[in-house]
Amino acid sequence: MGLGIPAPQPMRAVDYPAIRRLSQSLGRHAEPELWGSGECQLVIKNLDGQLLGWSRAHWWEPADATAPAGYYLAGIEVARGCRHRGVGRSLTEARLDWIAQRASSAWCVVNAQNAASLALHHSLGFEEVARAAQLGTVVFSGGSGVLLSKDLVSSRSAAKAQV
């Protein structure tokens, strides 16, 4: 955990208003009430209970020749004042732990223009699989998307070897 960032906690219905406010502050439109119940849904709050970020992961079947069905990192938002402080990394590592209990690989779709997200995912061992203007139901206006994958089996083996 980086620099005193609290651990991710399961998202609860009481968190939904703060998630919507955070999303709106970033020019987005999260609707947590519509998300599935079998997902990994996490939040990080400071000691005062203020939302610093949220994330989710779930099984996705994109019906796409390029992007396979699998467990995907599905969304993450971090408050502007909390970026580059470990919140996104902590949320992503927790989601990867959740996926590792269910699958041998994790997938992610990132806008090619999102350099910070690409850097984070590469630092966590994700590798680029493909680029396309559309991956599954995600259409990338003004650019392309990057399909990333991480082999969780070799990651677990490497972690065990270091112990």
Describe each PLM feature range:
Residues M1-I19:
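A short beta-loop-alpha structural element at the N-terminal edge
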